[in-house]
């Protein structure tokens, strides 16, 4: 408990010191009810500042006692108080905050606490990171930080925008009572009230910014023309162009309110200037903002709402929420100031070393501008798309044995109703139309990607009957969910950040809305990325993070279909039911399609013969399906690929952790990986309702223990917390048994060690188990090497396309960007006729004849001194630019063949010389 105020009594014998508290689990939450509230005697301990701080914040006794116990634990940590004296007061404030949140007793606002300990938002949260807190506190801090970030970005945007709209020194004749600063203040507080009323989700950036544009439109119409800059002055002139008098000014708001609903010229100008979708902003304007303004009932003064009246209205909201007083942004209060280097405020581009190029530097984007740009990019793709199936899709539907069109349309309609209701429930009931707009975009993307997938499958299999795939409900729900996730992420900040710091609509929200299992959603991600070429780099990263979330925990939930699939595969294939360990060192194949993933199990690749068909029109879906099932045992493509990706993700994280903790014992990494991989393959039940990283940390601790390496679990947890994806709940709240959770140390002792004790002890013996191969780690599953691959024994080089997309939306393919594209072969694209192959064969034959004649004449072609590249104008000095494409190709073939012939002759001569020497 905190110290009591000192008494004025005679000196007495000091009480005996209290017994030392038991050592707490560093990774374990402390439940509020479990902490002992032992009343200690603090008469001789003078901490008047702590007492004064609690009194100033009106902290109740039980909260003060909890805060003091928290302070005792915090102050015992080595180095926590190093730096400066002020840090002690700040830590007291943090301990009071922690106690108040844990006990659900918050007698003060967050801003009042900041003012009392004189610290900024970021300083407060940085200090809080040094303390192990409960999940409850973590969630409260996360909510506050996200709200602050959004408010900070929006105020910065409003301040800059008002500077572009209003004149700081207007012409004479304007009342001195009205100025740009006053308009900024009333605009900001009106926006705060509107945001609290309309947007239920505090950290939504896009809807909030659209609402801000509505507020700006409202006050532009209320402002006198002499205060406005162009083009806003011209847009607002028909409304506020008449001269003002004090009496007329008093009735101005009522007069303009009648014109608000019909006049949208100002808001159209605002949308154009900020590159916003005008239809979306108008929807917010008519459905949300105008009803809010009508119900506000604020008093007008000089044509503008009274600042004092607005501020008093906001005061009530602020005191009720107990968090940030956003009015302080207007004063640039130090408690709300960001750090000098703040990644949220602007996405800064690196400074160029050449000062002459300073003028050409890219202007850094604010968070609002960044999100608006990503939305604009999505609109470019989807504006020309339809929210109904295209003629090509309808043709595919008609070619199916069972036409899926009716079911697809009904599914889209039914899911739409569910989506809009869930969206409105999360964001605000007034935003149901916004949800409808976003769902419409998702449906457009859904049909677009579906058509691309079917075209790709048609080219690959030469069939048009996809009845089985197109009548698969899970496939459609997964594809629709992925399209909606792309749209939702585009409109939120979660794409730019870690998923855990996103909004309430962040992944896996869409899975809950559609009642879709994460493992089924995972199956479509890779195919979605491959066929939709216009996805931005950031969106591909976002989908990759979604895939990681699924692989690390979401796919391992107890109701996941993954466990049934593992069991079926195990029963069918015996001990090698999962991905073979020997295949881990092989590169990950990236040629899986949606049909492979959703129509598996298919025949095991090891027992499957490979056939190549060119221009085969007689191939049907039935024949293809029967070919898949002619041999047994069956193997699930989706399960095999899932385990390969899980192994690679697991090893990558383990490798990072080992580099930080076991750099002096590099040989242990392979042993830890073997135990880790063995657990995932043979003890996969341990993953049920748990996290991949929990098994990783337990594997590391177990091997270090048996190898007599002094590595405490606390050290492992501390290093793990520094990983970019880490969450405290991963090691604080681990499933022990049904509905019972505890720390990761308890899980290791009572569950992990009990299950794997025999296996772990084997690594201490003289004959340890065979080590598992290290997985092949590509840079990314969705990035392909651009280096050509030479096929052994031939003069053929295979190089991937520079980009996977085909002709779409007027964008050129990589082959179109190559001057000699007519002699390039793109495997997987529509080849047209066989003329191309015949032309290549003819070139090869002609080059062979040229080589023979050259060899007979004794004048082989002279090899080039340097390589020629497929770029127009390269090597102009030797005249190659003026050669026709066929002649260049022949010359290259001749040069390559000549070089190989000379190398073979040289090798043969060397062999003969060696044999002659041996004979001698």
From Swiss-Prot:
Residues 632-763 are annotated as: Domain B. The keyword Nucleus applies. GO terms for cellular component: chromatin; chromatin lock complex; cyclin/CDK positive transcription elongation factor complex; cytoplasm; nucleoplasm; nucleus; PML body; Rb-E2F complex. The modification N6-acetyllysine is found at residues 865-866. Residues 366-763 are annotated as: Pocket. SUPFAM superfamilies: Cyclin-like (SSF47954). Phosphorylated by CDK6 and CDK4, and subsequently by CDK2 at Ser-560 in G1, thereby releasing E2F1 which is then able to activate cell growth. Dephosphorylated at the late M phase. Phosphorylation of threonine residues in domain C promotes interaction between the C-terminal domain C and the Pocket domain, and thereby inhibits interactions with heterodimeric E2F/DP transcription factor complexes. CDK3/cyclin-C-mediated phosphorylation at Ser-799 and Ser-803 is required for G0-G1 transition. Dephosphorylated at Ser-787 by calcineruin upon calcium stimulation. Transmembrane segments: none annotated. Residues 1-34, 340-362, 895-920 are annotated as: Disordered. The modification N6-methyllysine is found at residues 802, 852. The modification Phosphoserine is found at residues 30, 242, 560, 600, 604, 616, 772, 780, 787, 799, 803, 847. Residues 573-631 are annotated as: Spacer. Residues 22-34 have a biased composition (Acidic residues). It is found in: Nucleus; Cytoplasm. The modification Phosphothreonine is found at residues 245, 349, 363, 366, 813, 815, 818, 833. Residues 345-355, 907-920 have a biased composition (Basic and acidic residues). Tumor suppressor that is a key regulator of the G1/S transition of the cell cycle. The hypophosphorylated form binds transcription regulators of the E2F family, preventing transcription of E2F-responsive genes. Both physically blocks E2Fs transactivating domain and recruits chromatin-modifying enzymes that actively repress transcription. Cyclin and CDK-dependent phosphorylation of RB1 induces its dissociation from E2Fs, thereby activating transcription of E2F responsive genes and triggering entry into S phase. The hypophosphorylated form interacts with and sequesters the E2F1 transcription factor, thereby inhibiting E2F1 transcription. Interacts with heterodimeric E2F/DP transcription factor complexes containing TFDP1 and either E2F1, E2F3, E2F4 or E2F5, or TFDP2 and E2F4. Interacts (when hyperphosphorylated and hypophosphorylated) with PKP3; the interaction inhibits RB1 interaction with and repression of the transcription factor E2F1, potentially via sequestering RB1 to the cytoplasm. The unphosphorylated form interacts with EID1, ARID3B, KDM5A, SUV39H1, MJD2A/JHDM3A and THOC1. Belongs to the retinoblastoma protein (RB) family. This is Retinoblastoma-associated protein. It comes from Rattus norvegicus. The lineage of its organism: Eukaryota, Metazoa, Chordata, Craniata, Vertebrata. The gene is Rb1.
């Amino acid at each position: 408990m905190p110290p009591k105020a000192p008494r004025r009594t005679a000196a007495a014998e000091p009480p005996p010191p209290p017994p030392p508290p038991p050592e707490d689990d560093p990774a374990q939450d402390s439940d509020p009810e479990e902490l002992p509230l032992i009343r200690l005697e603090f008469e001789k301990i003078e901490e008047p500042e702590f007492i004064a701080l609690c009194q100033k914040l009106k902290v109740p006794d039980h909260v003060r006692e909890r805060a003091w116990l928290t302070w005792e634990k915090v102050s015992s940590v080595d180095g926590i108080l190093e730096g400066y004296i002020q840090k002690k007061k700040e830590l007291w404030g943090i301990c009071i905050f922690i106690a108040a949140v844990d006990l659900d007793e918050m007698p003060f606002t967050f801003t009042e606490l900041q003012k009392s300990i004189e610290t900024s938002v970021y300083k407060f949260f940085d200090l809080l990171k040094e303390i192990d807190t409960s999940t409850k506190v973590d969630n409260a801090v996360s909510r506050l930080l996200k709200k602050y970030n959004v408010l900070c970005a929006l105020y910065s945007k409003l301040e800059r925008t008002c500077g572009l709209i209003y004149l700081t020194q207007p012409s004479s004749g304007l009342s001195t009572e009205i100025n740009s600063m006053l308009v900024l203040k009333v605009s900001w507080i009106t926006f705060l009230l509107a945001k609290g009323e309309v947007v239920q989700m505090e950290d939504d950036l896009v809807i909030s910014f659209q609402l801000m544009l509505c507020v700006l439109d409202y006050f532009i119409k209320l402002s006198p023309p002499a205060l406005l800059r162009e083009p806003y002055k011209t847009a607002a002139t028909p409304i506020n162009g008449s001269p003002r008098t004090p009496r007329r000014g008093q009735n101005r708001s009522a007069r303009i309110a009648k014109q608000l609903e019909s006049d949208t010229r100002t808001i159209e100008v605002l949308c154009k200037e900020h590159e916003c979708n005008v239809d979306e902003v108008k929807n917010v304007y008519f459905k949300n903002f105008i009803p809010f303004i009508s119900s506000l009932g604020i008093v007008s003064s000089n044509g503008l709402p009274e600042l004092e009246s607005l501020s008093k209205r906001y005061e009530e909201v602020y005191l009720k929420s107990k968090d940030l007083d956003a009015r302080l942004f207007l004063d640039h209060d130090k408690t709300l100031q960001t750090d000098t280097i703040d990644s949220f405020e602007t996405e800064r581009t690196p400074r160029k070393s050449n000062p002459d190029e300073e003028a050409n530097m890219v202007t850094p984007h604010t968070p609002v501008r960044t999100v608006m740009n990503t939305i604009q990019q999505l609109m470019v793709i989807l504006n020309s798309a339809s929210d109904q199936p295209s003629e090509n899709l309808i043709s595919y539907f008609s070619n199916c044995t069972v036409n899926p069109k009716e079911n697809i349309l009904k599914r889209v309609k039914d899911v739409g109703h569910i989506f809009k209701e869930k969206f409105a429930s999360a964001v605000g009931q007034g935003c149901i139309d916004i949800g409808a707009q976003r769902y419409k975009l998702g449906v457009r993307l859904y049909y677009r990607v579906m058509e691309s997938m079917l075209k790709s499958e048609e080219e690959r299999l030469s069939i048009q009957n996809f009845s089985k795939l197109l009548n698969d409900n899970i496939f459609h729900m997964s594809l629709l969910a992925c399209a909606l996730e792309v749209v939702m992420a585009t409109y939120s900040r979660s794409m730019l950040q870690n998923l855990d710091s996103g909004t309430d609509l962040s992944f896996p929200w869409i899975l809950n809305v559609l009642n879709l299992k994460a493992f089924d959603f995972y199956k479509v991600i890779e195919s979605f990325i491959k066929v939709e070429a216009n996805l931005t780099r950031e969106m591909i990263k976002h989908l990759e993070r979604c895939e990681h979330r699924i692989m690390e925990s979401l796919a391992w939930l107890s109701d996941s279909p993954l466990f049934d699939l593992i069991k079926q595969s195990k029963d069918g294939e015996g001990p090698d039911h999962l991905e073979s360990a020997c295949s881990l060192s092989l590169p990950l194949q990236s040629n899986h399609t949606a049909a492979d993933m959703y129509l598996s199990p298919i025949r095991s690749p090891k027992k499957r013969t490979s056939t190549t068909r060119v221009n085969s029109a007689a191939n049907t879906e039935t024949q293809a399906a029967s070919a898949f099932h002619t041999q047994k045992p069956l193997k699930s493509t989706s399960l095999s690929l899932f385990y390969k990706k899980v192994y690679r993700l697991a090893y990558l994280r383990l490798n990072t952790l080992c580099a930080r903790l076991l750099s002096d014992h590099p040989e242990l990494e392979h042993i830890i990986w073997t135990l880790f991989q063995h657990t995932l393959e043979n003890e996969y039940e341990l993953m049920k309702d748990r996290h991949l990283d929990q098994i990783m940390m337990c594997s590391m601790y177990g091997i270090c223990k048996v190898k007599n390496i002094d590595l405490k679990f606390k050290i492992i947890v501390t290093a793990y917390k520094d990983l970019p994806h880490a969450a405290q709940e991963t090691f604080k709240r681990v499933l022990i048994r049904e509905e019972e959770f505890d720390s990761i140390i308890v899980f290791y002792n009572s569950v992990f060690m009990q299950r794997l004790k025999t296996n772990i002890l084997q690594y201490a013996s003289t004959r340890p188990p065979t080590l598992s191969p290290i997985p092949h780690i590509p840079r990314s599953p969705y990035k392909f090497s651009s280096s050509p691959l030479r096929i052994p024994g031939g003069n053929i080089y295979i190089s991937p396309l520079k980009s996977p997309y085909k002709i779409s939306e007027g964008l050129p393919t990589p082959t179109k960007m190559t001057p000699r594209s007519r002699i390039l072969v793109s495997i997987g694209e529509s080849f047209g006729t066989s003329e191309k192959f015949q032309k290549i064969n003819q070139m090869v034959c002609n080059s062979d004849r040229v080589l023979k004649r050259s060899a007979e004449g004794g004048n082989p072609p002279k090899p080039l001194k340097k390589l020629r590249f497929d770029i127009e104008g390269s090597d102009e000095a030797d005249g190659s630019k003026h050669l026709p494409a066929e002649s260049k190709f022949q010359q290259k073939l001749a040069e390559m063949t000549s070089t190989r012939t000379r190398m073979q002759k040289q090798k043969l001569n060397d062999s003969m010389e060696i044999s002659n020497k041996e004979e001698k």
